[in-house]
Amino acid sequence: MQITDVRIKLLNIDNRLKAIASVTFDDEIVIHDIKVIEGEEGLFLAMPSRKVGNDRYRDIAHPISSPAREKIETAVINKYNEEFEKQSSVETEPVTEENMETAENENE
């Protein structure tokens, strides 16, 4: 199976959960709710899961082989880094009286 699309939703919260991803395979099947988490040794993925019992979670979908897991991790983390760079490169100009006046004049 080939990964044909990766979509990332960056989360602007200050904790370990950095993003949620969806991965499409062969333009035919998609896995939603893959979590991108910041660990002590860098980013890693948590596959979608549901709670079973009091403190246990069970994956809803997950790769069966190490090469498949690595392929998904590489695709998702690369897309995360790409989207993070896009978001970080958006520069905002500090608000000053001068640029507020300019904006007001442009809107007239």
Curated annotation (Swiss-Prot):
Pfam families: SpoVG (PF04026). The keyword Ligase does not apply. Keywords: Cell cycle, Cell division, Septation. Residues 94-108 have a biased composition (Acidic residues). Transmembrane segments: none annotated. One of its GO terms (biological process) is sporulation resulting in formation of a cellular spore. HAMAP family: SpoVG (MF_00819). PANTHER family: SEPTATION PROTEIN SPOVG-RELATED (PTHR38429:SF1). This is Putative septation protein SpoVG. The lineage of its organism: Bacteria, Bacillati, Bacillota, Tissierellia, Tissierellales. The gene is spoVG.
